[in-house]
């Protein structure tokens, strides 16, 4: 099919590249001309495993092109995907300005019948608004062809987005027209050869499904973090509790890991938007507000734990951070727990030595003053980051942090304090290696106090 993808951000790039890989002709429209130039050269503006090679292959095969011209992108398109951002507004609601602006442009520039598909995460009723805007635009131009508007929310996980797109758990298509839904089913057919997981439903239901799914996953995380807090007070190890819970098939093993909170571009934004949507309907979303509050509290725990271990003595301290991105497999720093800790440490005059496999540059750009005065140093090696540190804090559970040389680490540190924000390590083993260990919702191992700086 001939496709147009509007927006060369995270969702747009994965969508465009993966559809092109299946033999479709895809034009990706991006208003940032510098980004377009980079993409035409095969340079990725984001980090996502496997995406760069697909993009370059499809560019070479001439199945994928990038343009800053919407008119060029729309020419002969059978299906048009809207994949632009819907950030949080000041009141927490989804900012639809980008989506609605695209709808206005489509009404003004479409030259043939097509299906417009919204992949952006949007509130209930947005497809109807987009459809009406396009209809009015076409009417002003006296165009009589039909444009169907469908909802097709994305369920991509950063760090595994390519695999998620190639092998989706499900494809949700919300459409008011049978033919549009069937066309989209055919478009996705190559990704579903071994299983039929296309769910056809109304547009409003499709829009709500994305919010509900993300809110539920965020709820699981916050629930486990709340249990971890109670475990910490009762001398119980949340990791044993997690295994006990996860063995129940009704609960499962996913998203039940206690830690230092969730971040990223989806969970915080979508929970916030759903809360705001409930408020607009006069509905009290008690659970969602508790989920959000618990997550905000969770992001403060690492700093508080360090304060206890340091006995409130921050002067002269150096803290090493492992992991800065909000999760492994991405360079995304949006609402990352690491930034809450980093900013608290800098406010208290602590020197921070940090390492992340891919997010160092993004952090340096966010904190140029701290980098300039060497209050924050970013290192290419995790071992370099711990040199002379009074504590090591694991914030993001990258695979390369799972089995490091702990003897080398202990020998490099000034004080062998290890705060495990993702419960990656075994407390007893860390104590055997000479560390003072503290996880999330786990009994402390090793000595209980750190010496003064």
Swiss-Prot record:
Substrate binds at residues 154-158, 210, 214, 255-259, 263, 327. Its EC number is 1.1.1.22. Signal peptide: none annotated. The keyword Hydrolase does not apply. It holds the Pfam family UDPG_MGDP_dh_N. The active site is at residue 266. It comes from the Bacteria. NAD(+) binds at residues 2-19, 121, 158, 269, 334. GO terms for molecular function: NAD binding; UDP-glucose 6-dehydrogenase activity. Transmembrane segments: none annotated. Pathway: Nucleotide-sugar biosynthesis; UDP-alpha-D-glucuronate biosynthesis; UDP-alpha-D-glucuronate from UDP-alpha-D-glucose: step 1/1; Bacterial outer membrane biogenesis; lipopolysaccharide biosynthesis. It catalyses: UDP-alpha-D-glucose + 2 NAD(+) + H2O = UDP-alpha-D-glucuronate + 2 NADH + 3 H(+). The keyword tRNA-binding does not apply. One of its GO terms (biological process) is lipopolysaccharide biosynthetic process. Keywords: NAD, Oxidoreductase. Belongs to the UDP-glucose/GDP-mannose dehydrogenase family. NCBIfam families: NDP-sugDHase. This is UDP-glucose 6-dehydrogenase. It comes from Pseudomonas aeruginosa (strain ATCC 15692 / DSM 22644 / CIP 104116 / JCM 14847 / LMG 12228 / 1C / PRS 101 / PAO1).
């Amino acid at each position: 099919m001939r496709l147009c993808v509007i927006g060369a951000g995270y969702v747009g790039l994965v969508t465009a590249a993966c559809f092109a890989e299946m033999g479709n002709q895809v034009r990706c429209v991006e208003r940032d001309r510098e980004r377009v130039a980079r993409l035409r050269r095969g340079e990725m503006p984001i980090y996502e495993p496997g995406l760069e090679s697909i993009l370059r292959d499809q560019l070479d095969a001439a199945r994928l092109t990038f343009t800053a011209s919407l008119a060029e992108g729309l020419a002969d398109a059978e299906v048009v995907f809207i994949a632009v951002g819907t950030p949080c507004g000041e009141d927490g609601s989804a900012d639809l300005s980008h989506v609605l602006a695209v709808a206005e442009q489509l009404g003004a520039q479409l030259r043939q019948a097509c299906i417009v598909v919204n992949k952006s995460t949007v509130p209930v009723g947005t497809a109807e608004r987009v459809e009406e805007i396009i209809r009015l635009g076409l009417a002003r131009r006296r165009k009589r062809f039909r444009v169907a508007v469908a909802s097709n929310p994305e369920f991509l996980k950063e760090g595994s987005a390519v695999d998620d797109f190639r092998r989706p758990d499900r494809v949700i298509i919300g459409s008011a027209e049978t033919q549009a839904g069937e066309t989209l089913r055919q478009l996705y057919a190559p990704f579903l050869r071994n299983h039929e997981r296309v769910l056809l439903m109304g547009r409003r239901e499709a829009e709500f499904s994305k919010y509900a799914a993300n809110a539920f996953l965020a709820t699981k995380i916050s629930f486990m973090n709340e249990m971890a807090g109670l475990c910490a007070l009762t001398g119980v190890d949340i990791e044993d509790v997690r295994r006990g819970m996860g063995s129940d098939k009704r609960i499962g093993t996913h998203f039940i890991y206690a830690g230092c909170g969730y971040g990223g571009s989806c969970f915080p934004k979508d929970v916030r938007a759903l809360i705001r949507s409930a408020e607009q309907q006069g509905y009290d979303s008690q659970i969602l507000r508790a989920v959000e509050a618990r997550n905000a509290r969770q992001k403060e725990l690492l700093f508080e734990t360090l304060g206890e271990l340091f006995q409130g003595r921050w002067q002269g301290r150096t803290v090493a951070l492992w992991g800065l991105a909000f999760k492994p497999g991405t360079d995304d720093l949006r609402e990352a727990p690491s930034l809450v800790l980093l900013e608290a440490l800098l406010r208290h005059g602590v020197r921070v030595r940090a390492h992340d496999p891919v997010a160092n540059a993004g952090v340096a750009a966010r904190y140029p003053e701290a980098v300039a005065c060497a209050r924050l140093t970013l290192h290419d090696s995790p071992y370099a980051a711990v040199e002379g540190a009074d504590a090591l804090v694991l914030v993001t559970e990258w695979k390369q942090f799972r089995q490091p040389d702990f003897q080398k680490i202990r020998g490099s540190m000034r004080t062998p304090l290890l705060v495990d924000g993702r419960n990656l390590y075994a407390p007893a083993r860390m104590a055997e290696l000479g560390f003072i260990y503290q996880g999330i919702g786990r009994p402390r191992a090793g000595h209980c106090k750190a010496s003064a700086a």
